[in-house]
């Protein structure tokens, strides 16, 4: 079972990577977008992994038999929860007047960051 230390490490790392990626993309609203995007990504990854831990979801951690992309359902769930939390935080809180395409794009970057961090870094 995944430990709280691993969950915390993965959430923080996902948030840092997502925040950095959004900072690169959001030129005019760099700090205003990047920090909340990183926090939302970390919160999403933390929430998903806490749910798996509480539900004893050991089978979600089985990696696909692909050398290039050994993803599991746990990795995918982190990306999905990061997408949802980032879309809500950015769309409803930080960038309410921004075009939906931009908000969803930033949220997708957060989801991809969380997914890739889960697959390759822990």
What are these regions (language model features)?
Residues 1-39, 45-122:
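Juxtamembrane/disordered regions of integral membrane proteins
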């Amino acid at each position: 079972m995944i430990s709280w230390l691993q969950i915390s490490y993965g959430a923080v790392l996902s948030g840092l990577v997502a925040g950095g990626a959004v900072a690169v993309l959001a030129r005019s609203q760099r700090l205003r977008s990047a920090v909340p995007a990183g926090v939302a990504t970390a919160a999403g990854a933390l929430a998903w992994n806490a749910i798996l831990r509480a539900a004893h979801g050991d089978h979600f951690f089985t990696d696909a038999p692909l050398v290039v992309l050994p993803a599991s359902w746990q990795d995918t769930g982190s990306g999905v929860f990061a997408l949802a939390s980032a879309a809500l935080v950015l769309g409803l809180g930080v960038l309410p007047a921004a075009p939906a395409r931009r908000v969803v794009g930033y949220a997708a970057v957060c989801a991809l960051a969380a997914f890739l961090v889960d697959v390759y870094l822990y």
